[in-house]
Amino acid sequence: MIDPQTLRDHPDLVIASQELRGASVEVVDQAVAADSERRRAVTEFEGLRAEQNAHGKLVAKADKADKPRLIAEVQELKARVTAAQERAQEAESALDEAMRRIPNIVIDGVPAGGEDDWALVREVGAKPSFDFAPRDHLEIGEILDAIDMGRGAKVSGARFHYLKGIGARLEIALMNFGLARALEAGLVPLITPTLVKPEIMAGTGFLGAHADEVYHLDDDDLYLTGTSEVALAGYHADEILDLAQGPIRYAGWSTCYRKEAGSYGKDTRGIIRVHQFQKLEMFSYVDPADAEAEHERLLAMQERMMQDLGLSYRVIDTAAGDLGSSAARKYDVEAWIPTQDAYRELTSTSNCTTFQARRLGTRFRGEDGRTSPVATLNGTLATTRWIVAILETHQQADGSVRVPEALRPYLGGLEVLEPAAAKAAR
């Protein structure tokens, strides 16, 4: 959640952020009113409790004649203190509920508007050209006997798939390539849980506007995560971190699950938008003063991956109205998909400032000895969807695919993915 002090001292900043997002400003007014009521209720409770304590001392010192009256007054005060405490607790809960309805305050410079109002940061790499009619990734995958959508649907339903043979090897190679880069950069690898408690899912901000995209196991009251960001954010919940040596950085590898609610009819062909996939997620805990620099660092790691995979891509600064509730700024990295004649998102990186840490109780101790919320950031370093861009970008006329040089060590030195028919004919 946002900093209550910012809400109290600068509600105009919160209102401006809501306007950039195209979101309700009434929730800000409601939170300001709830904060005022909480402070009034707490002041009343503390005043009555102090009066109760003072009367208790008088009873101890009173003579016999005055004690009955003073004891009666103490009993009356006790009832009033109990009632005031309940009102203070109710006011605290109301404030917490109101604060949780306010998304993160966007960072200066984030473009206003919705999904189509992003700002271009840069375009990198020449778009691939072909002297033949390029095939889409699913057709290539079928030629390679690498992707099986039919059996995925037979076993699990729409938007499920099998990666087979070289398809499975390609995904594992891609993930291992990302992991090697993460290790090189000093990130600590984690295999994360894919089932988390409601308070962790809510703490990361995934039970707000996008709650309908999350799978829930009703009998166990656990959520399936759509990204290891959730488990990585929860890893240090209710802890005080030592950032004296710099940021704490992780790379979480997990299977991810998404309902893809609201995407009916979109990307029904192939593996661009599926219910289950693999993802390697970077996650950083940093001093809030260093958060924007860390954001650029994560983006640079993602761009290096794109370049080494030989992909043409662009970076966009996502508009405020297209940000999730936790993000104060998000960069999307979109690769060129030849058969769609369009850029499609392959990865993103978000600066969540202290929003998630406040919800999850994750703090660090500053030089003055005081504790305060850390900043959290995340970004994807490899995921299943990248196979789409790799297959389409590096395809050849005979249905084979050139393996990007950087990926070859993770495929046993393989330089070309050959059509299954060609291999069978040998």
From Swiss-Prot:
A Gene Ontology term for the protein's cellular component: cytoplasm
MF term (GO), any: serine-tRNA ligase activity
InterPro entries listed in its UniProt record: aa-tRNA-synt_IIb, aa-tRNA-synth_II, aa-tRNA-synth_II/BPL/LPL, Ser-tRNA-ligase_type_1, Ser-tRNA-synth_1_N, SerRS_1_N_sf, SerRS_core, tRNA-bd_arm
Binding site for ATP: 258-260, 274, 345-348
Binding residues for L-serine: 227-229, 281, 380
Pathway membership: Aminoacyl-tRNA biosynthesis; selenocysteinyl-tRNA(Sec) biosynthesis; L-seryl-tRNA(Sec) from L-serine and tRNA(Sec): step 1/1
Highest taxon above the source species: Bacteria
Record comment regarding domains: Consists of two distinct domains, a catalytic core and a N-terminal extension that is involved in tRNA binding.
HAMAP family noted in UniProt: Ser_tRNA_synth_type1 (MF_00176)
Quaternary state and interactors: Homodimer. The tRNA molecule binds across the dimer.
Its biological purpose: Catalyzes the attachment of serine to tRNA(Ser). Is also able to aminoacylate tRNA(Sec) with serine, to form the misacylated tRNA L-seryl-tRNA(Sec), which will be further converted into selenocysteinyl-tRNA(Sec).
Protein name: Serine--tRNA ligase
Taxonomic source organism: Clavibacter michiganensis subsp. michiganensis (strain NCPPB 382)
Lineage: Bacteria, Bacillati, Actinomycetota, Actinomycetes, Micrococcales
